[in-house]
């Protein structure tokens, strides 16, 4: 080793080795990984999806939607990693910072324009997303499902919130405000604050007109859209996808048409 990065200096220092003491080794690794791969997140539009439920669905369907719109797209999810059309096996919800940057770098090589990424509370807590430039963040909902890792629900919520706290001011923070934690996510963010809901007044509001075995008919901000996805929870997912696609510049008519083609 030429240099060792550590949080605590060892008792016996070896000659010829530089020791760099940092407050957080995982945070330092994340910034080093970004720099090593030449900051690949800056060369595409990266959107992080966080929340207890809906992360995989929202990220995967956004990948599908932008592929159908003719773009080169990336996906970092629990199920798989996609570098445009090439599929790789996923190991964690949020891979380690070296893996994330490696795949973002591959996406740069392929000319990928948009990447959608699941962001877990474990990943945020372990600094795996540090050093990445996000175009936007999406908050789906919060329930007591992951308290095996976090000591309290408040800690779990605050870890999620820290993701939005760190978004740059030119990014967007899109949150579900039917979940009472949605507004908490927006408290200290510098990003543009955008809301979506089915029950409350919001920037993007949907109403379920028909709920059938074959799909849902939704009214989204005065426009009707049919989707093959079923269930109330998918109405929220579709709304998050519609809003994100519009925030990323997709034209409304095309957005509605592509949503009607999505399959879970």
Language-model regions, residue ranges each:
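Short, basic phosphate-binding NTP loop
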Residues: 1-48, 57-69, 201-205, 260
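Conserved helix/coil segment N-terminal to the catalytic DExD/H
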Residues: 122-130
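Short acidic/polar active-site loop segments enriched in Thr and Asp
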Residues: 2-3, 113, 135
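Acidic, Mg2+-coordinating active-site environments of NTP-dependent enzymes
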Residues: 6, 10-16, 135-264
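Conserved nucleotide-sensing/catalytic segment adjacent to the nucleotide-binding pocket
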Residues: 92-120
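Short beta-strand-centered segment that lines the nucleotide-binding/catalytic pocket of NTP-utilizing
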Residues: 70-84, 120
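Flexible beta-alpha connector loops of hexameric P-loop NTPases
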Residues: 86-97, 145-152
């Amino acid at each position: 080793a030429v240099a060792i990065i550590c949080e605590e200096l060892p008792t016996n220092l070896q000659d010829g080795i530089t020791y760099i003491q940092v407050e957080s080794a995982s945070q330092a690794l994340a910034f080093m990984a970004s720099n090593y791969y030449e900051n690949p997140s800056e060369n595409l539009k990266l959107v992080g999806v966080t929340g207890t439920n809906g992360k995989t669905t929202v990220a995967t369907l956004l990948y599908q939607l932008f592929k159908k719109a003719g773009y080169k797209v990336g996906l970092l999810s629990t199920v798989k990693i996609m570098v445009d059309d090439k599929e790789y096996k996923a190991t964690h919800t949020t891979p380690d910072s070296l893996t994330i940057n490696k795949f973002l770098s591959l996406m740069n090589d392929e000319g990928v324009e948009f990447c959608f990424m699941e962001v877990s509370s474990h990943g945020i807590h372990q600094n795996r997303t540090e050093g990445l430039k996000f175009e936007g963040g999406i908050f789906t909902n919060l329930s007591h499902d992951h308290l095996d890792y976090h000591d309290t629900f408040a800690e779990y919520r605050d870890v999620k919130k820290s993701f939005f706290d760190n978004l740059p001011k030119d990014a967007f923070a899109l949150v579900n405000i039917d979940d009472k934690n949605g507004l908490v996510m927006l408290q200290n963010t510098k990003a543009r604050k955008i809301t979506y809901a089915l029950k409350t007044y919001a920037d993007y509001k949907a109403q379920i007109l028909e709920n059938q075995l074959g799909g849902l008919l939704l009214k989204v901000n005065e426009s009707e859209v049919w989707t093959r996805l079923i269930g109330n929870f998918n109405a929220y997912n579709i709304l998050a996808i519609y809003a994100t696609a519009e925030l990323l510049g997709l034209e409304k008519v095309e957005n509605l048409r592509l949503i009607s083609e999505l399959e879970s």
